[in-house]
Amino acid sequence: MSAYGMPMYKSGDLVFAKLKGYAHWPARIEHMTQPNRYQVFFFGTHETAFLSPKRLFPYKECKEKFGKPNKRRGFSAGLWEIENNPTVQASDCPLASEKGSGDGPWPEPEAAEGDEDKPTHAGGGGDELGKPDDDKPTEEEKGPLKRSAGDPPEDAPKRPKEAAPDQEEEAEAERAAEAERAAAAAAATAVDEESPFLVAVENGSAPSEPGLVCEPPQPEEEELREEEVADEEASQEWHAEAPGGGDRDSL
């Protein structure tokens, strides 16, 4: 015991160390840095802090009280190390192996009373207890997160090309052209079928199919009609001369 009634510790002693905002943590005394101030090594997180004796509790006497399971990251690993590997160093078990543990995240600690009570990483870092450096995103990782809201995500589906309507119009134009060509071919076929009849009529010959075109009058019929007309005219002249003609004088 010290002159102040506080227990005295030596290097290698196992204790529970209490930081404000954290549970009583399994730790090991490294050495005394100044009167009533100890540097302690935290099991599970491999960080260090400078604490006064009033924040340190003997491990064996307080094991049942403070050694209950805790969901904070690194606590279960710390209990295992203090029992099975109490001489572990920071380089023996990298802190990165703790990232995959299922102990859950650490809650934010309360403000410490002094700078000397803040835990520091055994490798020289100044992070909080139970929060490894790897959990903090770097500036390079934060860079992509600063993308403006107007920029579309890279995985977003691309908009359909504007050339699609043009292709549809071209297809419609091709279909219309094909329809026009088919209509022209049908019309040409119809003209070819009617042309023999027209040629036959123009040449004065009878068409190959009767009944489709009126036959022109035959020359013999015209001559007969002309003869009939001439006979009628001659008969009329004879009857006109008969009543008062020169035949009476001859009689």
From Swiss-Prot:
Basic and acidic residues: bias regions: 128-144, 155-164, 236-251
SUPFAM superfamilies xref list: Tudor/PWWP/MBT
Pfam family, one: PWWP
Compositionally biased tracts (Acidic residues): 218-235
Gene3D superfamilies the record matches: 2.30.30.140
Region: Disordered, residue numbers: 89-251
Biological-process GO terms, alphabetical: chromatin remodeling
Residue ranges of every copy of the PWWP domain listed in the record: 11-62
InterPro entries per the UniProt record, alphabetical: PWWP_dom
GO cellular component, one term: nucleus
Disulfide bonds: none
PANTHER family: HEPATOMA-DERIVED GROWTH FACTOR-LIKE PROTEIN 1, HEPATOMA-DERIVED GROWTH FACTOR-RELATED
Family: Belongs to the HDGF family.
Identification of the protein by name: Hepatoma-derived growth factor-like protein 1
Organism: Homo sapiens (Human)
Lineage start: Eukaryota, Metazoa, Chordata, Craniata, Vertebrata
Gene transcribed to yield this protein: HDGFL1
